[in-house]
Amino acid sequence: MSKLTIVRGFNDVLPLDSYKWQFLESKVKLILDRYNYSETRLPIVERSELFHRSVGESSDIVSKETYDFQDRNGDSLTLRPEGTAGCVRMVIENNLATRGQTQKLWYCGPMFRYERPQKGRYRQFYQLGVEAYGFDGIAIDLEVIAIAWSLFKELGISEYVTLELNSLGSSLNRQEYTQALLQYLKPYHAELDEDSIKRLDKNPLRILDSKIEKTQKILANAPKLMDFIDHDLRLRFKQTCQYLDALGVRYKLNENLVRGLDYYTGLVFEWTTDKLGSQSAICAGGRYDGLVENLGGQKTAAIGFAIGMERLLLLLEDLGKLPNQDNACDVFFILDSAQLHQSLAIVENIRQELPQLKIDMDLKFGSFKSQFKKADKSGAKVAIIIGQDELDNGFAGIKFLQQNEEQQQVAFNELINFLER
């Protein structure tokens, strides 16, 4: 029989690593509570049509990377490759953005893309998503960027990340620019890299995102998207930059930042780092004011971003910003296996009364000698002995495992007071 192993591109989070996730998730919740965003939990499976209509048929994600399957009813379903589309579907289906309602939401969970696995890029990966609906003005753009900035500051990595900004303008602006870009690139067709040639027909704007040096040289003299953007949208982008200056948020302009999802309009942004090699983007987002309407809802202003949690953890680890793991328990009980009906009741009562304490015991209930060895290895400060003699006398034995103090006796009805000290 063959050995069962994990699927390529997927990862187990082992007990020794789970504390890193708990640390990061606690910081995420701290920041989002500060900005009064509400958590939502979304299904990992959606109808395939949702992503075809939102992410885009011609996008790399839909054309090459989704996990699609048919259920027993013959419906085409997809493991979600990103969270925004599902969040918009939920907002529409539950009438959360009608009649001028506003929503500030966040979610965190696994996404799935069939990509070549490498450091920082996996086939199952976790994303934090932050989405806001019903806000037209610049203030929400600034708030969403400030949320990411606040999280990076809370984690102690703000000096190692860079905010990159661009504006994609309106859909009409992009159509006009796309034609100008295609006209410019026509003489260079044979010199473009293979991926860029494929994108000429499907999604020409994505050529701007090419990392191939030869293609970048060709693009150096290409028409600039900003020159095709309406005056009011250019002014809005300029004002956004001015407000970021006032907030003290560092940024740089990136005219080639276009994002790989078709639904973005207006402001787009990424937070990047030079500490993770080729997987430099740890956060990306922007406005998607047309998506709610495109998916059947009312016309609704929208903006959001996603953070790759694994990449963020890699960065925290690389910079030494993760706390040390503390698996030590506070109290270790040494029990007589012949009297468990009494001693376990005492232990459970203490767990209920003092929930902040980490309490452990040897559930194999070996000899007292072997239990004391496990108590020493547990890192506990105190061992509490409850054997036959202790039960007969009404006192628990107290041994201090990390201090040179004599063993004490404490009455069972005083144990809680003793442990609270």
Curated annotation (Swiss-Prot):
Q: Which GO terms describe its molecular function?
A: ATP binding; histidine-tRNA ligase activity
Protein biosynthesis recorded as keyword:
yes
Matches recorded under NCBIfam families: hisS (TIGR00442)
The organism's lineage is: Bacteria, Pseudomonadati, Pseudomonadota, Gammaproteobacteria, Thiotrichales
Q: Which reaction does it catalyse?
A: tRNA(His) + L-histidine + ATP = L-histidyl-tRNA(His) + AMP + diphosphate + H(+)
Q: Where in the cell is it found?
A: Cytoplasm
Name of this protein: Histidine--tRNA ligase
Q: Which family does it belong to?
A: Belongs to the class-II aminoacyl-tRNA synthetase family.
Signal sequence annotation: none
Q: What InterPro entries would the database entry show?
A: aa-tRNA-synth_II, aa-tRNA-synth_II/BPL/LPL, Anticodon-bd, Anticodon-bd_dom_sf, His-tRNA-ligase, HisRS-like_core, HisRS/HisZ
- Quote the gene name from the UniProt entry: hisS
Biological process, per Gene Ontology: histidyl-tRNA aminoacylation
Primary subcellular site in the record, as a coarse category: cytoplasm
SUBUNIT field? Homodimer.
Please verify whether the record's keywords include Protein biosynthesis.
Answer: yes
The domain of life for this entry's organism is Bacteria
A Pfam family annotated for this UniProt entry: HGTP_anticodon
- The EC designation for this entry is 6.1.1.21
Keywords on record: Aminoacyl-tRNA synthetase, ATP-binding, Cytoplasm, Ligase, Nucleotide-binding, Protein biosynthesis
A single Gene Ontology CC annotation of this entry is: cytoplasm
